[in-house]
Amino acid sequence: MSPSIRALPGTTPLVLDSPHSGVVYSPDFNYACGLATLRQAEDTHVEKLYNFAPGLGVAWVEALFPRAYLDANRNTTEIDESLLDAPWPGPVETDPVVMSKVRLGKGLIWRATDDGAPIYQRVLTVAEVQARIASCWQPYHAAVAQAIDAAHARHGYSIHINCHSMPAVASNFATDFPGEEHADFVVGDRDGSTASTALTQRIRSHLAGLGYSVAYNHPYKGVELVRRYSNPGQHRHSIQLEINRTLYMDERTLEITGGFTALQASLRSLVALLLQTDPRAL
């Protein structure tokens, strides 16, 4: 297994992955901003919230590298060429919707933090970006694809939950909706294209029934991981689940708060529901 990821096989139809909770900052990162500022990009502690899942037979994949080093939830075409010392030799994304995040500094390799602080005071070589793709992006995506394929082969369907956390209020350079106050959860299926809407509705109803506020496809619809590995017509369902960080941690200090235990219990009940759900019967 690649040292940049942690992957645990499962026996059930359910696959969970956490692409943004990594905290291993490679010496070759050579960032210029403060570490505390950079760490605001993390989905800190998400892997701890779901640490019960592998014991239930759920496949688990997590990135150990930090999101700001390489964002595994982006395509390798989402290149910010303003960061590079030479033209990118591969294809570069041209879709204006996708490129809106690159313009905010949030491409495959981040240029700026959510508050707009520059991450580098240097240009990156094409070779070092290629090395990050080879050592981080490729093994992460291979592990997610393998886990989903294995779940689908065993059961005839797969449910993939792409696990994230979000700040209570959107920062100025984080989304196209700066200053927006987030719900407790945002459930995203890219407008019904990555999962059965009945399955998505079941998740939304379950969380709302537990007393949480739940938004749907706004402001987060899901990005590359749910897009790439979903095919509802073939019973491959992928859903992005965003959790408001104030439910379980102090956003300033990154320390776990007293709400962690109750939130984890809610997530355990959600996982139990999904393990009992066959989307083909919905």
Task: Give the ranges of each region predicted by the language model.
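N-terminal catalytic or cofactor-binding beta/alpha core of small enzyme domains
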Residues: 1-160, 165-282
